[in-house]
A protein has these predicted regions:
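Generic structural signal for hydrophobic core residues of well-folded globular domains
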Residues: 57, 72-73, 121-126
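Generic hydrophobic, helix-prone segments enriched in Leu/Val/Ile
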Residues: 66-76, 93, 114
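Short, cationic/aromatic linear interface patches
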Residues: 84-147
Length: 147
């Protein structure tokens, strides 16, 4: 319902005015659209579940997390004789990111301040996954039906 207001000017007749409740939503909408476009561009080559989770972070946080993630993967792959893709470690990465977010909340820290912690956590998780894969590769193949 539109409310009308009267402004009285004693020198002349009353003037009919409309309240100016209009806020400029176009700038806000445009900013959100730009952020979503930047997020899409940053996340597009990551596995889908990681994209979905990281899309909840701010653009600057995503830039830091993605950089740390790719450095951790490269560093880890350089130290072993195998090569893992992000898709090979998708579940492990997602678990690390969820724990990382919980630590950020508990310690009331920024992504930038905790990027060293994220790097160590990712490399540790990758090493554990690699160790489990190597153990699995060396286990004898047995079947419950052959006993």
């Amino acid at each position: 319902m539109l409310k009308l207001y009267y402004k009285f000017n004693f020198a002349t007749e009353p003037k009919l005015t409309y309240p100016n409740n209009h806020t400029n939503h176009s700038n806000h909408d445009n900013s959100n659209f730009n952020n979503e476009a930047l997020k899409f561009q940053l996340l597009e080559e990551l596995p889908q579940s990681i994209q979905n989770y990281l899309s909840n972070f701010e653009v600057t946080e995503i830039e830091i997390i993605k950089t740390v993630l790719l450095k951790a993967k490269t560093s880890f792959n350089n130290t072993i004789d195998s090569y893992y893709l992000l898709e090979d470690m998708e579940i492990e990465i997602l678990h690390v990111l969820k724990r990382f977010k919980a630590i950020l909340i508990q310690k009331n820290e920024t992504v930038e301040a905790m990027q060293g912690y994220l790097m160590k956590s990712l490399k540790s998780e990758f090493a554990e996954m690699h160790t489990l894969n190597k153990r699995r590769d060396h286990l004898p193949i047995t079947s419950l039906f052959n006993q």
